[in-house]
Amino acid sequence: MTVLRRKLAEAKAEGRAALVGYYPAGFPDVASSIRVVQAMVAGGCDVIEVGFPYSDPTMDGPVIQQAADRALAAGTTPKDVLAVVRAVADAGAAALVMSYWNPIEKYGVDAFAADLAAAGGSGLITPDLIPEEAEPWIKASDAAGIDRIFLVAPSSTDERLAKTCAASRGFVYAASLMGVTGTRDKVAATARRLVERTRAVTRDSGLPICVGLGISNGAQAAEVASYADGVIVGTGFCQRVLDAPDVDTACQQVRDFAAELAAGVRAAAR
């Protein structure tokens, strides 16, 4: 069992959703990004998605794009991404990488799976890879013993939901809004319906469903935690680092934000 699956099972046993935080490796630099993810874990994140900075992020909103651009400008490498993964694992959380498929192909699919596992990573989220085109990754992740997380969206047909959930391991990522990432004043009404539709597919397998895109405060985290197995937050963490005058302040604000979200998932009515 991967650390990811163990963390999700532990949260379920506590009667709550897991808190999943996203943060791009190398923003504003590698050493600072390690401090930030450590603060996220200290604040209550069960799982950290380490973003693999990429120059053409089709799903990312302006805040995460800005963070990724700065990480690339700072010279962040794939090895740096794996160093951040190791830091997350050492801090006691489950570590995932979230990456578009091109950088993984460029690295080498089998090599990335092996190196991610060696760094203490539990798996990979691939927002632009569909199961039908994922055979090399399915084989590589099986060989490395790590999880693979695919995405479903409100536009997904029932057939697409079934295929995606069957191919996913660890959890399936329910993107609750059409379009790019970012905080929203209200969590999309489509999120609950998407989880209901996905749950109909995963009922037998028990595959957890984690919801992302648009969660910006503890109350929204509680709302989503009332029906999802995990609550995914990224933009809010990046925004706090962008706004902070220095890394010490950024880490404190990130830790406080994680604590607010963690309190939210624990307060949810389930």
Swiss-Prot record:
It catalyses: (1S,2R)-1-C-(indol-3-yl)glycerol 3-phosphate + L-serine = D-glyceraldehyde 3-phosphate + L-tryptophan + H2O. It holds the Pfam family Trp_syntA. It comes from Thermobifida fusca (strain YX). Belongs to the TrpA family. The keyword Transferase does not apply. The active site is at residues 49, 60. GO terms for cellular component: cytosol. Tetramer of two alpha and two beta chains. Keywords: Amino-acid biosynthesis, Aromatic amino acid biosynthesis, Lyase, Tryptophan biosynthesis. The alpha subunit is responsible for the aldol cleavage of indoleglycerol phosphate to indole and glyceraldehyde 3-phosphate. GO terms for molecular function: tryptophan synthase activity. SUPFAM superfamilies: Ribulose-phoshate binding barrel (SSF51366). Its EC number is 4.2.1.20. This is Tryptophan synthase alpha chain. It is an enzyme of class 4 (lyase). It comes from the Bacteria. CDD domains: Tryptophan_synthase_alpha. The keyword 4Fe-4S does not apply. Pathway: Amino-acid biosynthesis; L-tryptophan biosynthesis; L-tryptophan from chorismate: step 5/5.
